[in-house]
Amino acid sequence: MEFRSGRAADRDAITGLFREAFGRRMARREWEWRFLRKPAGRGLIELAWDDTKLAGHYAVSPVRLRVRGKDVPAALSGTTMTHVWYRGLGLFPLLARRTYARARQAGHVLVMGFPNRYSHRGLVRDLGWRDVYEVPRLSLHMGDRRRETEDGGVAEVVELERFDRRFDRLWDEVKDTCPVSVVRDRRYLQWRFAENPESRYRIFALEDGRRVSGYAIAKRYGEEMHVVDILCLNADTGVRLVRRVAGTAARLGLPVVSMWLNPGLELRRELERLGFQPGAPVTYFCVLPLAAASRLRGACDFRNWYLTMADSDVY
């Protein structure tokens, strides 16, 4: 078995393994968007080859974190694949350790991830990951509350196609509200949502003259509307944005609006008053520290995080 770093020429073999592992095709533009065009940098990919057969794949993609007033490099874990012929041979831990060594060498302070129930135990037991939180889904089952979620009073909420410079100003205003968060500047938002080749997101923003005081990103998934990301100057703005998303969901006949939001936030408490409740499914959130504790400064404590569905590569 040969282990080496992935490169652009391996794209066809990687997308072929993706189809075998997940039962769907990954288009060339999706692969390039995910691994080559991310604003924080190119993905770190490690591969296991059996002669000309791609047996295993693991990758992390760079992210910029805001940690207590400083932007620091980090990475998001994702896209773990082993060909069915080679499962049970221990390829994943070998690929993971190679990937983490490269990430540490590149200066990343941590790797963050959202493992499923199959991979969680091995990451924590064998690879040094730490549990940060089990994130519940915060859901509104509208029912009799439909009238409370209608669009009255949210006329200033507009729907946009792209992100302009006002979103950089919004980020500058709120970036140190929570001690730890993924950098949500205009460039990141444009890549993550407007340029995503596989998913369609709806961008809602509350305009206040020439500024934007908040945004919410929504995506339909089955019979639910997900608030994939939300960022705002204050809780009142957030409530107005969520009400707009809920009103849109109601018009589409969707009975549930769901999201992730840290329980320590004022907006979370206001949404609970509106009828949102935490529940299943619950998602593991873990980190692998790669730097000294002085550089992490509380990144292993969920109370410090601003976390939404957008921080996962699933939504």
Regions from the PLM with identified roles:
Residues E46, G56-Y58, A75, T80, ...:
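Conserved GNAT-family N-acetyltransferase fold
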Residues D50-A55, A59-R68, I217-E223:
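Acetyl-CoA-dependent GNAT
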Residues L110-D151, Y215, K219-D236, R243-Y315:
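Active-site/acyl-donor-binding loops of N-acyltransferases
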Residues D71-V84, E223-N234:
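Conserved acetyl-CoA binding element of GNAT-fold acetyltransferases
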Residues W85-G88, L94-Y118, G122-V124:
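Membrane-interface helix-loop-helix junctions at boundaries between adjacent transmembrane segments
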Residues T82, R87-A101, A235-G247:
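Conserved acetyl-CoA-binding loop-helix of GNAT-fold acetyltransferases
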Residues A8, S61-L65, T80-T82, P115-Y118, ...:
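An acidic- and aromatic-residue-enriched active-site/binding cleft used to recognize and process polar
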